[in-house]
């Protein structure tokens, strides 16, 4: 147990050093970058999913600069009540620790962002169901990021509502039961933590409080 504790402590310090280095050298945000938000406290999403470096990532948004290279930065994000454009300063204020991801494949940035923009105004999908008219945060990315040939950058993965023990958590059982539904465990979908771990995403920087 002592050696395990030492390994955990070492991992913590390595992770903090990595984040500090990345924050100091974070590159300028580019069109189509992905902003992964790390929650300050565990929640129902981070209880059943895990982000890059085991970070508690529970949201993702798409960087978009309005009006060309010198225009203001916004993010396109799926939040309640609907997909919207949010000024970058507002997003950073609401999400104080953000990991910056960049797709490392030759994808069609212009078309991908344009597809995301077409979703602005669509209702937020708090049921996380595939194939409906509503959209949740990582689904916005998964559905709309495309390669030059039109195929999707990100395939779906089986939805996870279970914790590390393999049991579906009480929160999600109660959440769906109150809506007269079964938990959609294993249905095709996505989540922001898993998206941050994809091999085609490189974490190139971070923003967090000093």
Regions found by a protein language model. Name each.
Residues 4, 19-26, 103:
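Short stretches within intrinsically disordered, low-complexity N-terminal or propeptide regions
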